[in-house]
Amino acid sequence: MTLLQRLIKQAKKPNGFVGSVMLRIMNVAHSGMNTWLIKHCDICDGDIVLDIGCGGGKTLQTLSKMNPGGKIYGIDFSEQAIKDSIKTNKMDVANGKVIVKQASVSNIPYTDQFFDTITAFQTHYFWPDLANDVKEVFRVLKHGGKFIIMSELYKIHYHMKVYKTTSEIEQLFESVGFQKIQIIQNARKGYLCIIGMK
């Protein structure tokens, strides 16, 4: 396995000391996207929010600050990511505002129509089966809720065999049942934001 392959494996499912270092690097590297996320999230105070693939927990922290009266949930299938997310959000976890669980996007451990907003920040290109996983997201999203995918374009093109184009993603969202789909790009930074309303 090459060094690049090892780093990609750690980015997908961080593990151990190297995984923890990778998560800290991602927390810093993604701060610009977190700022951009704030502009497009439009979260109402009191919302129940899920971040899928919460990684090192920086996005959970951002979402918590945006939503002082709400609850923020995070899932990741990496045990190391869960540990690091809890550490990053220690006070909010202790007071019950942030709840973090080890889980897969393919089987989200919450009831139907539970969340007002669901985010997937730099993760959807790692999901096991994007079409079925988007259906699972739709299941736990409330009517009127929104699903936000945010990613760097080059990562989509590198990691994904299908759903590489905005039209393919838009068709997927429509086929699942999302009513209003908005695609926002920051060409200068190479960011893509897809918002689907249920």
Language-model features: locations:
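Conserved beta-strand signature within the Rossmann-like core of class I S-adenosyl-L-methionine
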Residues: G145-S151
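Conserved alpha-helix/loop element of class I SAM-dependent methyltransferases that forms part
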Residues: V28-D47, T62
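A short acidic, Gly/Pro-enriched loop at the edge of an enzyme's catalytic core
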Residues: S106-I118
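Conserved SAM/SAH-binding beta-strand->alpha-helix loop
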Residues: S78-Q80
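Conserved SAM-binding loop of SAM-dependent methyltransferases across substrates and taxa
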Residues: G56-N67
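Conserved SAM-binding loop
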Residues: S85-I86
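A short glycine-rich, Lys/Arg-flanked "PGG" loop and its adjoining helix->strand segment in the class I
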Residues: A131-H143
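A short SAM/SAH-binding and catalytic strip from SAM-dependent methyltransferases
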Residues: T117-D129
